[in-house]
Amino acid sequence: MNKTLIIVDAQYDFMEGGKLPVEGATAALNNIVEFLNSGEVSTVITTQDWHNGKHCSFKEQGGEFPEHCVAETHGADIYKPILDAIEKNNLLNFSLYKGKYLEEFSAFTNRTEGYAHWFEYATTDSTDPYLQFHEDEQVIICGLAGDICVMNTAIALKDMNVVIADNLTASLNEDNFRKLADQYNITIVEV
């Protein structure tokens, strides 16, 4: 079975000490590195919150969150050991930026102009085999934060063979993460 790993928002601003820290983020991201080195994954999709400096989700603009993941800042960068593991293992990697102007929790509601909407390619009759999910493909979703962007990405793909890797994910609210998984019938596994 082919396995695609979707790594959601593994960015410095979501790690402990970041601008919007998720407890357990460093451990989850280090587990992702180990999984990338395991040889079990053939394709990786990385997503990044990629906000402008006056993003609608920021408290200063009337939003819910502190400023975080501003484009072209260190806080918006993906955790370097993950990028190193992708390169070391020569994994096919697609990168998605989300939320430049609008609030986008799911990687697959990406409306950020200038960036390809990967999901449209993945679910069509694309002739490029790397841009198409197959019936026998397992999609493993992980990253930060489990109860927000990871869960919304899983919900967008819930009709596919998709699971969330619990040991590769950290949540702001673990109870909410579990309730949402039950509500939307999303399978949570250890990998």
Predicted stretch roles:
Residues 2-6, 11-13, 18, 27-43, ...:
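Active-site-adjacent betaalpha module
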Residues 23:
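Substrate/cofactor-recognition hotspot
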Residues 48:
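Catalytic-core segment of enzymes that process non-peptidic bonds
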